[in-house]
Amino acid sequence: MPSNQTIISIAAATLLLVSHAAVAQDQVVKIGISGPLSGANAFAGKDNENGVRLAVEELNAKKMTIGGKTVRFEILSEDDQGDPKAGVIVAQKLTDAGVRFVLGPYNSGVAIPASRIYNDAGIIMSTVGTNPKVTQGGYKNVFRIVASDNQVGSSMAAYAARQLKVKTVGVIDDRTAFGQGVAAEFSKQAKASGLKVAGHEFTSEKATDFAAILTALKAKKVDAIFFGGYAPQGAPMARQMRQLGLKDVKLLGGDTLCSPEMAKLGGDAVGENVLCAQGGAILEKQANGPAFQKRYKERFKRAPDVYAASFYDQTMFIAQAMKASNSIDPSVVGIAMHNSSYKGVVGAYAYDAAGNMKQSAVTVYTFKNGAPVALASY
């Protein structure tokens, strides 16, 4: 007759086997994240990662099933440093790791070369890279999850002409794919709106001294300066504008300036003198926006930055398409995404054949008390 200890041991072993069998029934779907997790734009990369992570945690808690098996999402996050060469290495690394979906890159200059690798591997890439070239490669599984430079740059120019009554503008870009693209679109719309573009100066994404180019634009008596670049350069530029007597000249920019980091780095030099245009509607005015902000802050102990909500939404859209197509195969899921739409916390998502959003709101912000404040949404 078996002892009580033997019976307990057999029961424990049986429970362990059942547990392993349950795990074996899981389908693991690896989601890659590519973004700048080090360097000046690490704040943006981490914010984007947090948006994906929050979505994945919520999806795993729901235990979604595909083909009768529970789907378990795993995140593989890599630092592409905001550098095109590093981004290509990250793309190959994520491909080799068996990733099926990639959220990122953040930078257009990284997204453009990386998209070829992801496409060749049949991986869906969802990026906030706004340069129009990102979706011009003819890759069916590339999705731009926000407005493009065409919309962002032109919206800022139109606002400057109509609302700010600007007459003469200067333009500066940092020579990155993003900076050049958004500056070109701003200049095009500025001229179409009757503004005089008095000069176009250049800097780099690592520069800290802008005195020479700001002085050149000051001599041309500009009412505003549009900067195609990132917050780590935009903030010191705002400070130096004040130091050079340009305190009444507006500093305008694209989505990369619409971050609390801009005010954090620029201090009191960043206020209502700085305006930026960002793809997406006003989050706090969306039906589920405040609830998302609350969950994000509870989880990460900080407020969401520019694109956390967009990455959260796209992750949820991918899951919806998986469920609708009853597949985890990116080639099948991609078709389902092109043929459907998703209502997210920051807007509605539907894509054209090239992977651009069919409709995307653009919101113009300024800064008050160290935080971005929405002025208008189009």
Positions of PLM-derived features:
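N-terminal signal peptide c-region/cleavage motif recognized by signal peptidases
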Residues: 18-21
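Expand to "…catalyze enediolate/carbanion chemistry for C-C bond making/breaking, isomerization
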Residues: 15
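Extracytosolic ligand-binding ectodomains
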Residues: 2-12, 24-378
